[in-house]
Amino acid sequence: MKGVGTDSKAGNMSPKNLLGTTIGDMLRCATDFRSKVIGIALKDRASILPAGHSANAAYWYDKSVAGVITSSYYMEKLPDWVKKFNREAGMKKGYDPKSGADGVTLTFNMAEAALKNEQLGKGETPDMLCISISSTDAISHKTGTWLSPGKENEEVFLTLDRDMKKFLEALDAQVGKGNYLLFLTADHGGSHNPNTLKEHKLPGGGCDMGAKMRDLNEKLKAEFGLDIK
Protein backbone atom coordinates (compact mmCIF):
# COMPACT_ATOMS: atom_id res chain seq x y z
CA MET A 1 0.00 0.00 0.00
CA LYS A 2 1.39 3.40 -0.94
CA GLY A 3 0.21 6.94 -1.31
CA VAL A 4 -0.98 8.33 -4.62
CA GLY A 5 -0.31 12.03 -4.96
CA THR A 6 2.11 11.98 -2.02
CA ASP A 7 5.24 10.24 -0.79
CA SER A 8 4.29 10.68 2.87
CA LYS A 9 2.78 8.01 5.09
CA ALA A 10 -0.50 9.94 4.95
CA GLY A 11 -1.24 8.00 1.78
CA ASN A 12 -0.66 4.54 3.24
CA MET A 13 -4.33 4.01 3.98
CA SER A 14 -7.12 1.59 3.08
CA PRO A 15 -10.31 0.11 4.60
CA LYS A 16 -8.57 -3.15 5.57
CA ASN A 17 -9.47 -2.70 9.26
CA LEU A 18 -13.14 -2.12 8.48
CA LEU A 19 -14.79 -5.34 9.68
CA GLY A 20 -18.23 -4.89 8.15
CA THR A 21 -19.65 -3.71 4.86
CA THR A 22 -21.23 -0.34 4.20
CA ILE A 23 -24.23 0.96 2.31
CA GLY A 24 -21.81 1.84 -0.48
CA ASP A 25 -20.65 -1.77 -0.68
CA MET A 26 -24.24 -2.98 -0.83
CA LEU A 27 -25.06 -0.47 -3.55
CA ARG A 28 -22.12 -1.70 -5.61
CA CYS A 29 -23.23 -5.31 -5.15
CA ALA A 30 -26.86 -4.53 -6.00
CA THR A 31 -25.90 -2.89 -9.30
CA ASP A 32 -23.32 -5.50 -10.30
CA PHE A 33 -20.61 -2.93 -9.49
CA ARG A 34 -21.84 -0.46 -12.09
CA SER A 35 -22.57 2.23 -9.50
CA LYS A 36 -19.82 4.65 -8.55
CA VAL A 37 -19.10 5.17 -4.85
CA ILE A 38 -16.67 7.92 -3.85
CA GLY A 39 -15.62 9.22 -0.43
CA ILE A 40 -14.31 12.74 0.22
CA ALA A 41 -13.03 14.31 3.45
CA LEU A 42 -10.03 16.07 4.91
CA LYS A 43 -9.34 13.13 7.24
CA ASP A 44 -8.40 9.77 5.73
CA ARG A 45 -10.71 7.64 7.87
CA ALA A 46 -13.61 10.04 7.35
CA SER A 47 -13.29 9.47 3.61
CA ILE A 48 -12.36 5.79 3.53
CA LEU A 49 -14.74 4.22 6.05
CA PRO A 50 -18.08 5.65 4.82
CA ALA A 51 -17.23 4.69 1.24
CA GLY A 52 -16.49 1.09 2.18
CA HIS A 53 -14.34 -1.71 0.79
CA SER A 54 -15.44 -1.65 -2.84
CA ALA A 55 -15.48 2.12 -3.37
CA ASN A 56 -14.21 3.43 -6.68
CA ALA A 57 -12.23 6.11 -4.88
CA ALA A 58 -11.63 7.82 -1.56
CA TYR A 59 -9.82 11.15 -1.36
CA TRP A 60 -8.42 13.00 1.65
CA TYR A 61 -6.09 15.92 2.35
CA ASP A 62 -2.35 15.79 2.97
CA LYS A 63 -0.84 19.02 4.29
CA SER A 64 2.68 17.95 3.29
CA VAL A 65 1.74 18.32 -0.39
CA ALA A 66 -1.05 20.87 0.15
CA GLY A 67 -3.45 18.77 -1.83
CA VAL A 68 -5.98 15.98 -2.07
CA ILE A 69 -4.49 12.48 -2.23
CA THR A 70 -5.54 8.84 -2.27
CA SER A 71 -3.80 5.46 -2.07
CA SER A 72 -2.86 2.59 -4.36
CA TYR A 73 -5.78 0.63 -2.87
CA TYR A 74 -7.99 2.62 -5.25
CA MET A 75 -5.79 3.66 -8.17
CA GLU A 76 -2.24 4.02 -9.43
CA LYS A 77 -2.38 7.74 -10.24
CA LEU A 78 -4.59 10.71 -9.50
CA PRO A 79 -7.18 11.58 -12.15
CA ASP A 80 -6.40 14.71 -14.15
CA TRP A 81 -9.34 16.54 -12.63
CA VAL A 82 -7.96 15.96 -9.11
CA LYS A 83 -4.55 17.27 -10.17
CA LYS A 84 -6.26 20.34 -11.62
CA PHE A 85 -8.25 20.81 -8.43
CA ASN A 86 -5.07 20.71 -6.34
CA ARG A 87 -3.35 23.27 -8.56
CA GLU A 88 -6.26 25.67 -8.33
CA ALA A 89 -7.03 25.18 -4.61
CA GLY A 90 -4.14 27.44 -3.63
CA MET A 91 -3.37 25.74 -0.32
CA LYS A 92 0.05 26.15 1.33
CA LYS A 93 2.26 23.22 2.28
CA GLY A 94 2.30 22.52 6.00
CA TYR A 95 -1.01 24.25 6.67
CA ASP A 96 -3.79 22.06 8.06
CA PRO A 97 -7.22 23.43 7.07
CA LYS A 98 -9.20 21.09 9.35
CA SER A 99 -9.57 23.61 12.19
CA GLY A 100 -10.81 26.45 10.01
CA ALA A 101 -13.71 27.43 7.81
CA ASP A 102 -11.55 27.08 4.70
CA GLY A 103 -11.49 23.34 5.37
CA VAL A 104 -15.27 23.25 4.97
CA THR A 105 -15.11 25.11 1.67
CA LEU A 106 -12.25 22.96 0.39
CA THR A 107 -14.23 19.79 1.12
CA PHE A 108 -17.40 20.95 -0.60
CA ASN A 109 -15.44 22.28 -3.58
CA MET A 110 -13.78 18.88 -3.95
CA ALA A 111 -17.16 17.16 -3.68
CA GLU A 112 -18.60 19.40 -6.40
CA ALA A 113 -15.58 18.70 -8.61
CA ALA A 114 -16.11 14.95 -8.14
CA LEU A 115 -19.81 15.30 -8.87
CA LYS A 116 -19.16 17.00 -12.18
CA ASN A 117 -16.00 15.27 -13.38
CA GLU A 118 -17.09 11.75 -12.46
CA GLN A 119 -20.55 12.45 -13.92
CA LEU A 120 -22.22 11.16 -10.78
CA GLY A 121 -25.95 10.66 -11.09
CA LYS A 122 -25.81 10.68 -14.88
CA GLY A 123 -25.81 6.93 -15.53
CA GLU A 124 -28.46 4.22 -15.48
CA THR A 125 -27.54 3.11 -11.95
CA PRO A 126 -27.49 5.25 -8.79
CA ASP A 127 -24.16 6.55 -7.54
CA MET A 128 -23.12 7.49 -4.02
CA LEU A 129 -20.98 10.41 -2.89
CA CYS A 130 -19.93 10.29 0.78
CA ILE A 131 -18.86 13.70 2.12
CA SER A 132 -17.48 14.07 5.63
CA ILE A 133 -16.89 17.54 7.05
CA SER A 134 -13.86 17.18 9.30
CA SER A 135 -13.68 20.84 10.34
CA THR A 136 -16.71 20.76 12.64
CA ASP A 137 -15.13 17.86 14.52
CA ALA A 138 -11.70 19.49 14.74
CA ILE A 139 -12.93 22.89 15.90
CA SER A 140 -15.17 21.34 18.58
CA HIS A 141 -12.22 19.37 19.95
CA LYS A 142 -10.03 22.47 19.82
CA THR A 143 -12.31 25.12 21.33
CA GLY A 144 -15.44 23.30 22.51
CA THR A 145 -18.90 24.23 21.36
CA TRP A 146 -18.94 27.58 23.12
CA LEU A 147 -18.21 30.57 20.92
CA SER A 148 -14.46 30.99 21.15
CA PRO A 149 -12.90 34.46 21.60
CA GLY A 150 -11.88 34.49 17.94
CA LYS A 151 -15.27 33.09 16.88
CA GLU A 152 -13.61 30.26 14.92
CA ASN A 153 -16.40 27.89 15.93
CA GLU A 154 -19.10 30.27 14.73
CA GLU A 155 -17.28 30.87 11.45
CA VAL A 156 -16.98 27.14 10.74
CA PHE A 157 -20.69 26.47 11.20
CA LEU A 158 -21.82 29.55 9.27
CA THR A 159 -19.53 28.51 6.42
CA LEU A 160 -20.93 24.98 6.60
CA ASP A 161 -24.44 26.37 6.16
CA ARG A 162 -23.48 28.55 3.18
CA ASP A 163 -21.38 25.89 1.46
CA MET A 164 -24.02 23.22 1.93
CA LYS A 165 -26.55 25.51 0.24
CA LYS A 166 -24.15 25.99 -2.68
CA PHE A 167 -23.60 22.24 -2.97
CA LEU A 168 -27.33 21.52 -2.96
CA GLU A 169 -27.68 23.99 -5.81
CA ALA A 170 -24.94 22.10 -7.66
CA LEU A 171 -26.84 18.85 -7.10
CA ASP A 172 -30.02 20.42 -8.47
CA ALA A 173 -28.13 21.57 -11.56
CA GLN A 174 -26.12 18.39 -12.13
CA VAL A 175 -28.59 15.67 -11.13
CA GLY A 176 -31.90 17.52 -10.99
CA LYS A 177 -34.36 18.26 -8.21
CA GLY A 178 -36.13 15.12 -7.06
CA ASN A 179 -33.52 12.87 -8.68
CA TYR A 180 -31.27 12.38 -5.68
CA LEU A 181 -31.51 11.21 -2.08
CA LEU A 182 -29.66 13.25 0.53
CA PHE A 183 -29.17 12.27 4.14
CA LEU A 184 -27.23 13.98 6.92
CA THR A 185 -25.70 12.23 9.91
CA ALA A 186 -22.91 12.60 12.47
CA ASP A 187 -20.77 10.23 14.49
CA HIS A 188 -20.85 12.36 17.65
CA GLY A 189 -21.55 15.81 19.01
CA GLY A 190 -19.33 18.26 20.81
CA SER A 191 -19.15 19.56 24.37
CA HIS A 192 -18.29 22.79 26.12
CA ASN A 193 -14.68 23.35 27.08
CA PRO A 194 -14.43 22.47 30.81
CA ASN A 195 -12.20 25.48 31.46
CA THR A 196 -14.88 27.77 30.02
CA LEU A 197 -17.47 26.13 32.25
CA LYS A 198 -15.29 26.74 35.31
CA GLU A 199 -14.87 30.39 34.38
CA HIS A 200 -18.64 30.77 34.55
CA LYS A 201 -18.97 28.71 37.76
CA LEU A 202 -20.60 25.80 35.99
CA PRO A 203 -19.75 22.21 36.97
CA GLY A 204 -17.47 20.29 34.67
CA GLY A 205 -14.04 18.83 34.32
CA GLY A 206 -11.60 16.97 32.15
CA CYS A 207 -10.02 13.55 32.14
CA ASP A 208 -6.28 12.93 31.96
CA MET A 209 -6.33 9.71 29.94
CA GLY A 210 -2.55 9.46 29.98
CA ALA A 211 -2.49 9.40 33.77
CA LYS A 212 -5.33 6.89 33.92
CA MET A 213 -3.55 4.56 31.48
CA ARG A 214 -0.33 4.75 33.47
CA ASP A 215 -2.23 3.94 36.67
CA LEU A 216 -4.02 1.02 34.99
CA ASN A 217 -0.76 -0.39 33.62
CA GLU A 218 0.85 -0.19 37.07
CA LYS A 219 -2.05 -2.14 38.57
CA LEU A 220 -1.88 -4.78 35.82
CA LYS A 221 1.85 -5.09 36.38
CA ALA A 222 1.40 -5.51 40.13
CA GLU A 223 -1.44 -8.02 39.77
CA PHE A 224 -0.24 -10.12 36.83
CA GLY A 225 3.42 -9.25 36.39
CA LEU A 226 2.74 -7.68 33.01
CA ASP A 227 5.25 -5.09 31.91
CA ILE A 228 3.19 -3.09 29.44
CA LYS A 229 5.05 -0.51 27.39
Name every feature range the model reports, one short phrase each.
Residues M1-M91:
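Long, well-ordered early-domain segments
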Residues P15-G20, D96-E112, K122, P149, ...:
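Phosphate/oxyanion-binding active-site loops and adjacent basic polyanion-contact surfaces
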Residues M1-N12, H53, K77-P79, F85-R87, ...:
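Secreted, luminal/periplasmic, and some membrane-associated catalytic domains
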Residues I48-A57, K122-L160, K198:
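Active-site His/acidic residue clusters
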